[in-house]
UniProtKB/Swiss-Prot annotation:
PROSITE patterns: DEAD_ATP_HELICASE, HELICASE_ATP_BIND_1, HELICASE_CTER, Q_MOTIF. The gene is rhlB. This is ATP-dependent RNA helicase RhlB. Keywords: ATP-binding, Cytoplasm, Helicase, Hydrolase, Nucleotide-binding, RNA-binding. It catalyses: ATP + H2O = ADP + phosphate + H(+). GO terms for molecular function: ATP binding; ATP hydrolysis activity; RNA binding; RNA helicase activity. It is an enzyme of class 3 (hydrolase). The keyword ATP-binding applies. It holds the Pfam family DEAD. GO terms for biological process: RNA catabolic process.
Length: 434
C-alpha cells in the first residue's frame, strides 16, 4: 500500500491503537487524505458516517482504520461464537472485496483480529472452511454473504461495525434488497458503528443510510472537477478503417507500462484482444463471459506486470482498483457519460500522472457532446498522419489461447515482427488544434 499525502493531518495525530499505527507506519501511511482527515474524527468518536468520496481518495483506509480501532476499543460480546463476525464490510464487486481484504490483512498484522473474505465464483466449501474457524471482520459481496447466513454457517447477531462501500454501485447493480436483508439480521443500529461511502449521496443512498444507520453525519469530498487534473486527456477522430491501426500505433509509440483499453461490447473487446495479442503485446481480456478464476488470474498478472494491456468492458471492469495504470484508451466513447469519468479515473490516482486517449469514431462520436457537457470542459483534439500508422500488423490471434506468460520486451519477442527486430516506435506525427 502506498499513497501520496493530500493533507497536513497525520494518522499519528489521532487516538489510534498502537497496533494500528504500527501497521500504518510499516506500510508507508503517515499523512491522511482529505476524506480520512474529515471522517476519522467522527468515526473515532463512535459516530456514524455517510461519506461522499470518489474512488482513489483513500476512503478504504478511512473505514478500515475506524473498523479495526473500534473492535480493539470495544469488547466482543461474551456470548459471541466463532461463527459470528464482529464486523461486516459489503462491496458491490468481487474485485473490490478482494482489494479491501488485501488492505485489511495488512492492518490486521499486530491486532490479533482475523479477516475473512467471501464472494461468488469461488469454492463455497473452501470459503466456508475459513468461516467455520471464525473471523472477526467479514468482507464480501452481498450474494455470497446471504448464502452463508441462510445456511446457518454464520450469524450477524453480534455485529459491532458495518461498512457499505460504493453504495451507489449497489443500487446500479440491483443489490439493495440484499443489503436490507442483511441489515435486518444485525443488532439495532444504535449498537453498531455504521459507515457508508458512495461516489454520490443521492436521495436513494441517503434514504438507505437513514433507514439503517444511527443519525449519520454527512462528509462530502466533492471534486471541483469530475476528471482529475493529473489526467492528460486527448481525443482522435479516426475513420472506422483506421481505428485499429491507430490504436496499435499509439500503443507502439507510447509503450505504456500499464494500460486499460475500454470498448463498449464484448465482441469488440475480443477483437481488440486478438489484434493486440497477434501484435506481440502481453494482453488480458475481461468481459462478462470470463470465468471468475481466470478473471482473478488475469488481474493478478496485470497488477504484477506480467500483463501490460488489459482490454475490458465497463461491466467487467467495475470495482477494479489497480494502482499505477499509466494509460487509458477509450476505443469506443461510452454511451453513459459517467462511464467516461469512471474509465479515465483508473489512471492518475493518488497524485500520479495519467493519460487518457479516446476515439470519436463514426459510430460513437455523437456521445461526445454529452460527455463534454458532463465533465464541463472540451477534450483536446489530436490529429494523426494516416501514412504514419503501422501497416505491417500481423494477423489477429485466435481467442482461445493459453494465458499470457512473462516475456521480455527486447528483440525476438515484443515487436519482433518489425524489420530487424527493432523495438523503436515510429512517430505518430500528430498535431494539436489551437
Amino acid at each position: 500500500m502506498s499513497q501520496t499525502h493530500l493533507s497536513t493531518k497525520k494518522f499519528a495525530d489521532f487516538p489510534l491503537k498502537p497496533e494500528i499505527l504500527a501497521a500504518l507506519n510499516e506500510n508507508g501511511f503517515e499523512f491522511c487524505t482529505p476524506i480520512q482527515a474529515l471522517s476519522l474524527p467522527i468515526l473515532l468518536n463512535a459516530k456514524d458516517i455517510a461519506g461522499q468520496a470518489q474512488t482513489g481518495t483513500g476512503k478504504t483506509m478511512a473505514f478500515l482504520v475506524a473498523t479495526f480501532n473500534h473492535l480493539l476499543n470495544v469488547a466482543a460480546p461474551e456470548s459471541r461464537k466463532a461463527t459470528e463476525p464482529r464486523a461486516i464490510i459489503m462491496a458491490p464487486t468481487r474485485e473490490l472485496a478482494i482489494q479491501i481484504a488485501k488492505d485489511a490483512k495488512l492492518l490486521a498484522a499486530h491486532t490479533g483480529l482475523k479477516v475473512g473474505i467471501v464472494y461468488g465464483g469461488e469454492s463455497y466449501e473452501t470459503q466456508r472452511a475459513v468461516l467455520d474457524k471464525g473471523v472477526d471482520i467479514l468482507i464480501g459481496t452481498t450474494g455470497r454473504i446471504i448464502d452463508y447466513v441462510r445456511q446457518g454457517v454464520i450469524s450477524l447477531s453480534h455485529i459491532q461495525a458495518v461498512v457499505l462501500d460504493e453504495a451507489d454501485r449497489m443500487f446500479d447493480l440491483g443489490f439493495i434488497k440484499d443489503i436490507r436483508f442483511l441489515f435486518r439480521r444485525m443488532p439495532d443500529a444504535k449498537s453498531r458503528l455504521n459507515m457508508l461511502f458512495s461516489a454520490t449521496l443521492s436521495m436513494k443512498v441517503q434514504e438507505l443510510a437513514y433507514d439503517h444507520m444511527n443519525d449519520p453525519e454527512k462528509v462530502e469530498i466533492e471534486p471541483l472537477e469530475k476528471t482529475s487534473k493529473n489526467i492528460k486527456e486527448e481525443i482522435f477522430y479516426p475513420s472506422m478503417e483506421d481505428k485499429m491501426r491507430l490504436l496499435l500505433s499509439l500503443i507502439e509509440e507510447d509503450w505504456p507500462d500499464k494500460a486499460i483499453v475500454f470498448s463498449n461490447t464484448k465482441h469488440s473487446c475480443e477483437k481488440l484482444w486478438s489484434y493486440l495479442e497477434g501484435d506481440g503485446h502481453r494482453v488480458g481480456l475481461l468481459t462478462g463471459d470470463v470465468p471468475q478464476k481466470k478473471r482473478i488470474r488475469i488481474l493478478e498478472q496485470f497488477t504484477s506486470g506480467e500483463i501490460d494491456v488489459l482490454v475490458a468492458t465497463d461491466v467487467a471492469a467495475r470495482g477494479l482498483h489497480i494502482s499505477d495504470v499509466s494509460h487509458v484508451y477509450n476505443y469506443d466513447l461510452p454511451d453513459d457519460c459517467e462511464d467516461y469519468v469512471h474509465r479515465i479515473g483508473r489512471t492518475g490516482r493518488a497524485g500520479q500522472k495519467g493519460i487518457s486517449i479516446s476515439f470519436a469514431c463514426e459510430e460513437y462520436a455523437l456521445n461526445l457532446p454529452e460527455i463534454e457537457t458532463y465533465i464541463n470542459h472540451s477534450i483536446p483534439v489530436s490529429n494523426y498522419d494516416k501514412d504514419a500508422l503501422l501497416d505491417d500488423i500481423p494477423p489477429p490471434a485466435r481467442i482461445h489461447r493459453k494465458p499470457p506468460t512473462s516475456r521480455t520486451r527486447d528483440g525476438g519477442s515484443k515487436g519482433a515482427h518489425r524489420s530487424g527486430g527493432n523495438t523503436s516506435r515510429p512517430p505518430r506525427h500528430r498535431t494539436r488544434r489551437p
